[in-house]
UniProtKB/Swiss-Prot annotation:
GO cellular component assignments: cytoplasm
Catalyzed reaction equations: 3-methyl-2-oxobutanoate + (6R)-5,10-methylene-5,6,7,8-tetrahydrofolate + H2O = 2-dehydropantoate + (6S)-5,6,7,8-tetrahydrofolate
Entry binding sites for 3-methyl-2-oxobutanoate: 43-44, 82, 111
Higher taxonomy: Bacteria, Pseudomonadati, Pseudomonadota, Betaproteobacteria, Neisseriales
Entry protein name: 3-methyl-2-oxobutanoate hydroxymethyltransferase
Species in which this protein is naturally found: Neisseria meningitidis serogroup C / serotype 2a (strain ATCC 700532 / DSM 15464 / FAM18)
Residues forming the catalytic site: 179 (proton acceptor)
């Protein structure tokens, strides 16, 4: 079974980590069998599964239900579950109560969004036995504050994002996830923190990559984000597509130049 120690050893060895979102047991089992090391039960389910316009309406009850489903299908992969909007920002104690519910539902790690200001919560959780993935850069729960889905950390804002990563690393975060961050900055962050980094739209130099399942399978019609690749092209099955994703992450051929953001 993949553990926090496994991820640390992979970072040290330069072996890339493959992560995908999963929301139910059958896909979790398929991804697990295909060699995906980490399964993210993301609040992205609000958009991908529930058909909502953002992640904000997703409840803790929703997250626990889908975590239970994924846990029934996964045998080897690490399960990371999102703390949903409103379930952890009020206080460290509120965050612990919500995280404990997700862990009881089958999560091995919880993910929270936010920079330096959330590092205290990261420390509070990890000191109480709950591994934390700290999500920085573009944090979808703050999309309205950002004014849309925009690249974060460009120009003069680069140092602030680096500070966010270091604060969570110092607080004991098990993983730092960066979304929509210039590739060179993501590389600098990866080299500056002791914990593994996972990127989505953050270049090829992170310690691992993550995509939303529906994106990598080409399920969403119309225009997709720059960092998305449809791995179903040329494949005869979903499992083959997932294996292709894992292989390209491991070989460092995904993300390619067309999937990354410059400063």
């Amino acid at each position: 079974m993949i553990t926090v120690n496994t991820l640390q050893k992979m970072k040290a060895a330069g072996e890339k980590i493959a992560m995908l979102t999963a929301y139910e047991s059958s896909f979790a089992a398929l991804m697990d069998d295909a060699g995906v090391e980490m399964l993210l039960v993301g609040d992205s389910l609000g958009m991908a599964v529930q058909g909502r316009k953002s992640t904000l309406p997703v409840s803790l009850r929703d997250m626990c239900y889908h975590t239970e489903c994924v846990a029934r299908g996964a045998k080897n992969a690490m399960i990371v579950s999102d703390l949903p909007f409103g379930a952890y920002q009020q206080s460290k104690e509120q965050a612990f109560a919500a995280a404990a519910e997700l862990m009881a539902a089958g999560a091995h790690m919880v993910k929270l969004e936010g920079g330096v200001w959330m590092a205290e919560t990261t420390e509070f959780l990890q000191m109480r036995g709950i591994p934390v993935c700290a999500h920085i850069g573009l944090t979808p729960q703050s999309v309205f504050a950002f004014g849309g889905y925009k690249v974060q950390g460009r120009g003069s804002k680069a140092q602030a994002l680096l500070n966010d990563a270091k604060a969570h690393d110092d607080a004991g975060a098990a993983v730092v996830l960066m979304e929509c961050v210039p590739a060179e900055l993501a590389k600098k962050v990866t080299e500056s923190v002791s914990c593994p980094t996972i990127g989505i739209g953050a270049g090829a130099d992170c310690d691992g990559q993550v995509l939303v399942m529906h994106d990598m399978l080409g399920i969403f019609p119309g225009k997709t984000a720059k960092f998305v690749k449809n791995f179903m092209h040329g494949q005869s099955s979903i499992q083959a597509a997932v294996r292709a994703y894992v292989a390209e992450v491991k070989a460092k051929t995904f993300p390619a130049a067309e999937h990354i953001f410059a400063d």
